[in-house]
A protein has these predicted regions:
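Residue(s) in the substrate-gating loop at a strand-loop-helix junction
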Residues: 132
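C-terminal helical subdomain
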Residues: 174, 187-224
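Short alpha-helical oligomerization interface
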Residues: 90-102
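Rossmann-fold cofactor-recognition segment
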Residues: 45-60
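Active-site helix of classical SDR
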Residues: 112, 148
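Conserved NAD(P)H cofactor-binding loop of Rossmann-fold oxidoreductase domains
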Residues: 82-88
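Conserved glycine-rich cofactor-binding loop
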Residues: 10-11
Length: 238
């Protein structure tokens, strides 16, 4: 039986990923801040998974919780880092910005470090980080979120390079979704993907050990267009 941990499993992409992996027969470790939602999800899945509350803004406790989850689940093959927060910033607010940095940036680095340490000792494994197409866009209305996702994508690329250079049999998978129909996306957006379809593509890519996954597939062309388009032209639309 394959085993995976999902950090940020209480709603949206993480919740759907738990459902699809459970259906495939995975034994899961479900982690999130909202424990009541995790318990409800686990009940829906037959109460066969390990549930644990984690708050990525409490760094010491979060580190201990991840280590405990790994110890309880045993022989974990995949660790999926899905936790993230973000909304539009009509005014700059340091308290909000710090929350985004703590969860999206510091939390991901902390969880990745624990995961890498474990997989190095295990001599194999896969870290999956959920970034965003926002990593390639500097929006003035969501600048902290976009910057945090740019960090996520860059950090995972660096982690992948480190694993390859050290000849470690560890797969680093970066997932960059476009707009997915989840509670985090509160309004109708262009090319909105149903969460079931989006996660199905993610799971397929994860199981194929892909290093970079764009969701949905057309997002790859959007990213390519952004990279070749002059900045002055992009600014007309963002």
């Amino acid at each position: 039986m394959k085993k995976a941990i999902i950090v940020g499993a209480s709603s949206g992409i993480g919740e759907e990923m738990a459902k699809q992996l459970s259906e495939k027969g995975y034994q899961l470790g479900l982690m999130a801040r909202r424990i009541e939602l995790l318990n409800t999800l686990n009940d829906e899945l037959g109460s066969k998974h390990v549930v644990m509350q984690i708050d990525l803004q409490n760094f010491d406790d979060a580190e201990n919780k991840m280590k405990t989850m790994i110890s309880e689940l045993k022989d974990v093959e995949i660790i999926i880092l899905n936790s993230g927060i973000g909304t539009q910033e009509y005014q700059l607010n340091w308290k909000y910005q710090k929350q985004v940095i703590d969860v999206n940036v510091s939390g991901l680095v902390l969880m990745s470090t624990v995961a890498m340490d474990y997989f190095i000792k295990r001599e194999r494994g896969q870290i999956v980080g959920i970034s965003s197409i926002a990593a390639h866009i500097s929006s003035g209305l969501a600048l902290t979120y976009c910057a945090s996702k740019a960090f996520v994508s860059s950090y995972l690329n660096g982690l992948r390079s480190r694993a390859r250079r050290s000849k470690l049999p560890i797969t680093i998978t970066t997932i960059e979704p476009g707009y997915v129909d989840t509670p985090m996306v509160k309004s109708e957006m262009p090319w909105m993907a149903p969460v079931g379809k989006a996660v199905s593509q993610m799971v397929k890519g994860i199981e194929n050990l892909e290093q970079h996954i764009y969701i949905t597939k057309r997002v790859r062309w959007v990213v390519w267009f952004i990279k070749i388009t002059p900045n002055w032209l992009i600014r007309r639309f963002i």
